């Protein structure tokens, strides 16, 4: 897989950089594994906006992805690599020996015709799912369960992988992509290897319209709003925000405020918190 740049025939193509989709082998999704999904467009059940800057976008059908990998010790062959409009990672379509078809997150380097399997004593190969307790130290893993049997909840984005650092008692230590080191129960399942399509981080949408196709609406800086719309608004010209620090539209501190609960039970499982990015290096927007 590689990235594709365009000649500047138009302002939109001047900055456009996309993946070349060379790894995609299937043109249409598996009919038995797609469902229609109502899009809330950032509204709750009363129609009130609870998440700003959401709406529009191209119609999508949701692909049912197997995050549990609960078909134990049954070989599956990779039949195709498909595009998924709901995530940056690709999907691998598996044909199991018993005739069932399932989607999984496509690991990096997986090929059509390759065999994958999940179980407690399966080969140490990329794409195979197994408990963390049987994986060798230093392994790169993805699609990690937080609770055994609940399905993968961590490390599912394109190009992501966690590293198995240590094993002690009933827990194993994982270094997550955020650099956080966290303890996970050893019986939790994970998939060997890293998620594919890592080149997505080098792409550029190129124009505002492609962002709208993804269902994202424009963001407006608070400093150019009226005082009734945002705490940063008002003033003559490019006036400062008039506060000790930036705040959200609802007056709460922004940029750097910790949002994790202090007494959360799982705090005992976090060995080392992720590194905090300074405000200067973050270069965040005026919310």
Curated annotation (Swiss-Prot):
List this protein's GO terms for biological process.
Answer: translation
Instruction: For the region Disordered, give the residue spans.
Output: 220-287
Query: What SUPFAM superfamilies does UniProt report for this protein, alphabetically?
Result: Nucleic acid-binding proteins (SSF50249), Translation proteins SH3-like domain (SSF50104)
Claim: Metal-binding is one of the keywords in the record = no
One family from Pfam that matches here is Ribosomal_L2
Give any Gene Ontology cellular component.
large ribosomal subunit
Single annotated GO MF? structural constituent of ribosome
Q: Could you tell me which Gene3D superfamilies the record lists for this protein?
A: 2.30.30.30, Nucleic acid-binding proteins, Ribosomal protein L2, domain 3
Q: For this UniProt entry, which residues form the secretion signal? A: none
Q: Supply the alphabetized keyword list.
A: Ribonucleoprotein, Ribosomal protein, RNA-binding, rRNA-binding
Q: Where is the composition biased (Basic residues)?
A: 271-287
What domain of life is recorded for the organism?
Bacteria
Q: What does this protein do?
A: One of the primary rRNA binding proteins. Required for association of the 30S and 50S subunits to form the 70S ribosome, for tRNA binding and peptide bond formation. It has been suggested to have peptidyltransferase activity; this is somewhat controversial. Makes several contacts with the 16S rRNA in the 70S ribosome.
Show the NCBIfam families listed in the entry. Answer: rplB_bact (TIGR01171)
Q: Which family does it belong to?
A: Belongs to the universal ribosomal protein uL2 family.
Q: How does it assemble?
A: Part of the 50S ribosomal subunit. Forms a bridge to the 30S subunit in the 70S ribosome.
What name does UniProt use for this protein? Answer: Large ribosomal subunit protein uL2
Q: Which organism is it from?
A: Prochlorococcus marinus (strain MIT 9515)
């Amino acid at each position: 897989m590689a990235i594709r740049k365009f000649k500047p025939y138009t302002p939109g193509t001047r900055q456009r950089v996309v993946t070349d989709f060379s790894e995609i082998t299937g043109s249409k999704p598996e009919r038995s594994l797609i469902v229609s999904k109502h899009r809330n467009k950032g509204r709750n059940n009363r129609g009130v906006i609870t998440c700003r800057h959401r709406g529009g976008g191209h119609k999508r059908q949701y692909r049912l992805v197997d995050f549990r990998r609960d078909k134990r010790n049954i070989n599956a062959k990779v039949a195709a690599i498909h595009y998924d409009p709901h995530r940056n990672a690709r999907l691998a379509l598996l044909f199991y020996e018993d005739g069932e078809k399932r989607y999984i997150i496509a690991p990096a380097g997986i090929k059509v015709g390759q065999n994958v399997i999940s179980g407690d004593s399966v080969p140490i190969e990329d794409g195979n799912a197994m408990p963390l307790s049987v994986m060798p130290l230093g392994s790169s893993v993805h699609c990690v369960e937080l609770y055994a049997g609940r399905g993968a909840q961590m490390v599912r984005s394109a190009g992501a992988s966690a590293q198995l650092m240590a094993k002690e008692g009933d827990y194993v230590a994982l270094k997550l992509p955020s650099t956080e080191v966290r303890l996970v129960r050893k019986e939790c399942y994970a998939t060997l290897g890293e998620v594919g399509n890592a080149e997505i981080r080098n792409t550029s949408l190129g124009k505002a319209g492609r962002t709208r196709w993804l269902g994202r609406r424009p963001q407006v800086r608070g400093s150019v709003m009226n005082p009734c719309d945002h705490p940063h608004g008002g003033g003559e010209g490019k006036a400062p925000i008039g506060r000790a620090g930036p705040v959200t539209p609802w007056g709460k501190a922004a940029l750097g405020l910790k949002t994790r609960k202090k007494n959360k039970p799982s705090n005992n499982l976090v060995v080392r918190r992720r590194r905090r990015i300074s405000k200067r290096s973050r270069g965040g927007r005026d919310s």
